[in-house]
Amino acid sequence: MTLTENVMKPQIQRFTRDHDPKVLWQVVEEDGAVIIEGFLPHEVIQKFDCELDVRSKATKGGEMNQEFYQMPVPTTTKWMNDLTATCPTFRHEILNNDILHSLCNVAFEPHGDYWLLNGMAMEMMPGNPTQQIHNDHGTHPILQYLRPDAPAPVFSIITAVTEFTESNGATRVILGSHRWPQGQKAKDDQAVRAALQPGDALVMHRSTKHGGAAHDADNQDHRRLLLTCMGTCQLAPYETNVTVPRPIVESMTPLAQKMIGWRSTRPVISNVTGLNTVRMKHLENQIELKSNVPLNVGGC
């Protein structure tokens, strides 16, 4: 796809981070995607990128846990999970981001409380191949049986840690594909690119077709992103955080603790018992969980 062909198509709408979250979510529901410029402040992205430098050095490309399913993965991609335990910026600043929660409050109003289903960093290196176009609800197959007009139970956010350009594989997005009938095949020429600056975020409906593009071998940039999947608390997280050391959890805010499953949640009525409880009581009270306790851990 050439740049000229890309420009001739309707593009992903862009808004600044101070825009009304109700409008932002309305665009997601109508178009399937929206770009929020400055979703994460520059200083937050800088610190997070610094922490990922450490993770990246200890991570080999092409290594992905395949205990559940065997599939080929490119050696030019690194996957970095367990961000709550290993990245202070993720647990203290990203999980408390005001724009994130404003958007979640709008999106999940029909469902009640929400939490983090997945938080994962990725790094794509020169020569990384084109990613197959897909949507992000494959982790929870039950979602495919929802009515098309059902309130959104989940959405995805791709935040640029480094710049996204055409030559380093900026994400391809097919606007309107979230309204397609099940089984409709995507074509590459239907996609537009999500060019992003560090800190910009691409917010997508759960059914929107998208995929990374090829990273030119002669472009020596390493493209990094943060993929966060937010969902109603009625869905089990893709990645559990029960293994995060308690002192780390207790250094976090109550809101961030709820995001990683260390507090009970409250869906809307008809649920009258809460979820993630102990003997029908609040988890955090039963385990005497503290919060905002300083943790003596060095940053980067």
UniProtKB/Swiss-Prot annotation:
Cofactors: Fe cation
This protein's record includes keyword NAD: no
Pathway the protein contributes to: Alkaloid biosynthesis; Secondary metabolite biosynthesis; terpenoid biosynthesis
GO MF term set: dioxygenase activity; metal ion binding
Entry's Gene Ontology BP terms: biosynthetic process
This enzyme's EC code(s): 1.14.20.-
Job of this protein: Iron/alpha-ketoglutarate-dependent dioxygenase; part of the gene cluster that mediates the biosynthesis of okaramine B, a prenylated indole alkaloid that possesses an unusual octacyclic ring system, including a four-membered azetidine ring and an eight-membered azocine ring, and that exhibits insecticidal activity against silkworm larvae. Within the pathway, okaE forms the unusual 2-dimethyl-3-methyl-azetidine ring to yield 12-deshydroxyl okaramine E from okaramine A. OkaE also catalyzes the hydroxylation of 12-deshydroxyl okaramine E to produce okaramine E.
UniProt subunit comment: Homodimer.
Name of the featured protein: Iron/alpha-ketoglutarate-dependent dioxygenase okaE
Species: Penicillium ochrochloron
Organism placement in taxonomy: Eukaryota, Fungi, Dikarya, Ascomycota, Pezizomycotina
Annotated gene: okaE
